[in-house]
């Protein structure tokens, strides 16, 4: 029996994911389930609870073990995935302490990113010390939600980044190119345009690195943002577990691909279970 809490994927039995605790009926069904499907953005307690009963799609282990942009940096390092030189700070007081001890920053301009937030929110290009301290003071109001932030050098590139979307065993790519004067972020929500097949060689390089990351982590539903420097070196920027679907052909196309890949994943799980039962 396949149990789904994700409206986009129909199971043998389907529910909306509850806000609080699962009902006795739902828990009883979990105990019978061969597989459980969850929405890609859910609470950690729901995810870990479901995993106690059956294999879960999507795999969100890394999302909860390595949260936010800070967590992504640690994950990239462990997996041997290239990323920009990065300084990690766990709050403004730590930043001030390390500066007082003589730690040097990158040369201006550099990029400051609060660990949380998506769509380019809380990502700033800093051109001088005055701008830096103005931005850090803005972060102060968000410290209760998580104080960590990172600083990375600004890498010269062609104002485009590549998004590699992982859906099960499928790896789909598209470029986001920023053509708005004065805007350095390549988010579609900030005016970037979507293009396809701009550089197949770089796209294949990015897919190979993404496959390596997925093999090491189990990630099977996420979008990777990757930048290429002027000399074509790849740098992974972040992992998006919730992502827009416009570049994939829209909602309906995404739903079709998702259901195809979930079906493949379920068949793989059931096949492995059959092998174990024979052994």
List each model region and its residues.
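Active-site nucleotide/adenylate-binding loops and adjacent lid/helix of ATP-dependent enzymes
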Residues: 1, 63-149, 204
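Conserved N-proximal alpha/beta basic substrate-recognition cap immediately N-terminal to
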Residues: 2-90, 100-101
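Short glycine-enriched loops at secondary-structure junctions
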Residues: 39-43, 62-63, 177-180, 227-231
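Protein kinase-like catalytic core scaffold
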Residues: 110, 150, 172-173, 222, ...
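Short strand-connecting beta-turns/loops that link adjacent beta-strands
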Residues: 117, 169, 229-232
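Phosphate-binding site of ATP-dependent enzymes
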Residues: 124-213, 217
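A short glycine-rich, hydrophobically flanked beta-strand micro-motif that places a catalytic Asp/Glu
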Residues: 152-153, 219-231
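C-terminal active-site "lid" helix and adjoining low-complexity regulatory extension at the edge
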Residues: 228-279
């Amino acid at each position: 029996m396949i149990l789904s809490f994700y409206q986009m994927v129909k199971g043998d039995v389907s529910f909306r994911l509850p806000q609080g605790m699962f009902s006795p009926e739902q828990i009883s069904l979990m105990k019978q389930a061969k597989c459980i499907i969850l929405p890609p953005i859910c609470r950690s307690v729901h995810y870990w609870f479901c995993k106690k009963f059956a294999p879960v799609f999507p795999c969100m282990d890394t999302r909860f073990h390595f949260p936010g942009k800070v967590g992504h940096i640690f994950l990239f390092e462990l997996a041997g995935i290239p990323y920009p030189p990065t300084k990690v700070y766990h709050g403004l007081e730590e930043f001030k302490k390390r500066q007082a001890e003589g730690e040097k920053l990158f040369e201006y301009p550099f990029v400051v990113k609060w660990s949380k937030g998506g769509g380019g929110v809380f990502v700033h290009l800093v051109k001088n010390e005055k701008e830096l301290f103005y931005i850090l003071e803005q972060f102060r109001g968000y410290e209760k939600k998580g104080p960590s932030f990172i600083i990375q050098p600004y890498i010269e590139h062609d104002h485009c980044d590549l998004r590699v979307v992982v859906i099960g065993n499928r790896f789909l790519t598209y470029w986001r190119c920023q053509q708005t004067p004065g805007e350095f972020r390549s988010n579609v929500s900030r005016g970037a345009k979507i293009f396809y097949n701009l550089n197949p060689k770089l796209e294949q390089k990015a897919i190979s690195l993404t496959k390596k990351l997925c093999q090491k982590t189990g990630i099977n539903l996420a979008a990777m943002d990757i930048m290429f420097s002027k000399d074509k070196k790849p740098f992974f920027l972040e992992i998006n577990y919730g992502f827009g679907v416009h570049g994939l052909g829209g909602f309906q196309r995404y739903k079709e691909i998702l259901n195809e890949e979930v079906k493949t994943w379920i068949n793989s799980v059931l096949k492995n279970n059959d092998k174990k039962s024979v052994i």
